[in-house]
Regions:
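A short C-terminal helix-loop "cap" of Rossmann-like NAD(P)-dependent dehydrogenase/epimerase domains
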Residues: 55-57, 171-174, 198-209
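N-terminal Rossmann-like NAD(P)+-binding domain of SDR-like oxidoreductases, especially those catalyzing
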Residues: 1-183
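Glycine/proline-rich active-site loop of Rossmann-fold NAD(P)-dependent oxidoreductases
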Residues: 158, 183-196, 203-205, 209
């Protein structure tokens, strides 16, 4: 198998960031096969994906949750690269339904990391969040900034982040942890800050911070 013939498992690939990434690698790597696992919550939409992808033999979609260990193990075993976007990702929602966040973000990540530990892959990329840092104590912030999450969502992401790190140390999984700061782009849900600001501005409403 050459570099251009990988099978990539992407969780949460129908969401905002995940779908942009799926579309990108589908176009850039013509021989990559893509397996997409997504629960299709309110934030996931298969219409975010390129129309031609859905008819391609390079693409397979599985409707499921990362907490479902059996399907996760099955799909990881078929993959060389695993990229984990799937998560509940809204600070305010996490305040009112924090159980869902800890189940999806922490237990779901554990299921995936367990599968990677048992079915070795070439790379496991975990998408964390800058929310794990809390309020900035240094300028600029870097990876050495202490983790001080300020919401249930941030705490769940911090838990998943440290879980993956522990698996890198304990089981030597080939993991990378990415902590993106505020993202903006196509397919972003209107509950997020920048789309909300744009809609408010178009309606001549005040921009509430």
């Amino acid at each position: 198998m050459t570099f251009n013939e990988k099978t990539v498992l992407i969780t949460g690939g129908a969401g905002f960031i995940g779908s942009n990434f799926v579309n990108h690698i589908y176009k850039k790597y013509a021989k990559y096969k893509i397996i997409l696992l997504d629960a299709l919550t309110y934030a996931g939409n298969l219409d975010n994906l390129l129309p031609e992808m859905k008819q391609s033999d390079r693409f397979r979609f599985f409707h499921g949750n990362v907490m479902h260990g059996d399907i996760v193990k099955e799909l990881v075993a078929q993959s060389q690269i695993v990229i984990h976007f799937a998560a509940e990702s809204h600070v305010t929602r996490s305040i009112y339904d924090n159980t869902l966040f800890f189940e999806t973000d922490v237990i779901g990540t554990q299921m995936l990391a367990n599968a990677v530990a048992h079915h070795p892959v070439e790379r496991f990329i975990h998408i964390s969040s800058s929310e794990v840092y809390g309020t900035a104590e240094t300028d600029p912030m870097d990876e050495n900034h202490p983790l001080k999450p300020l919401s249930p969502y941030a705490a769940a992401k911090a838990g998943a982040d440290r879980l993956v790190y522990s698996y890198i140390q304990t089981y030597q999984i080939p993991g990378i942890i990415v902590r993106p700061f505020n993202n903006y782009g196509p397919y972003q849900h209107i509950e997020k800050a920048i789309p909300n600001f744009i809609i408010s501005a178009l309606q001549d409403q005040p921009l509430t911070l």
